[in-house]
Amino acid sequence: MRAIITRHYKTLINAAEEILGWGDSPRDSGWKADVEYVSTQLQKRGVKFDAVYSSDLERARQTAMFHARRFGINIIHDTPALNEVNYGKLYKKKKKWVAEHYPQYKKDPDFVYPEGESFRQMQQRSVAFLSSLAKTNPQQTVLIVAHAGVIRGFISHFLGLNYADHLRHKISHRYIGDFQFDGESCVRYDELGKPSGFVHEGVIEIPVSCVAAGSRPVPSAKIKSAPEFSSLSAKHI
């Protein structure tokens, strides 16, 4: 399977440097230029999609609908498995305030936010979903609209990077990640949009033999299935 993964449009809360998580927010004034950029880059490369997936948060669903229309797809599939990390009661708090009062913020992937979840838990559910999708749809090319935290989790897991080191890594609203799978294993990673900084020397090829043998770095936490997020909601647009 080939998964093209991008981020949702920019919101007013994103622009205000506040915590968003599972909440939602109106679009920022410059949102359309970012979304147009992503669609244009994919169209220039002649990418065709079999399906479109997103989190079930409004900013991701609306971005997915925009792209789906551009590519002639009438249904999007949304799932909470792709949701941003749940910051619980920290919703709409200033990020600077959170960093001062919670020193674990974007430093400890196992810290559970009050009434929310940890980055590790978010990574586990989202990676479980993507791995299952790749295994069951080996011949498809899919578009996935997700969130910065989810994207960091994907890259850290599939490239074998230390998750804690990348929790503060900036992900542009013009990011386009190109993940190619053999079964559940990601064997190739590229970036087609604004560079994220994760890749410094172009395309990363991960030989299947190396993945199977475990000769590349792997995350410290095992990825578990997430049955509570196993169902998808299909929406006609």
Regions inferred by a protein language model and the residue ranges of each:
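Acidic, low-complexity terminal tails and accessory targeting/binding regions
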Residues: M1-R2, K44-R45, I73, V85-K96, ...
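Short basic (Lys/Arg) and small-residue
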Residues: H147
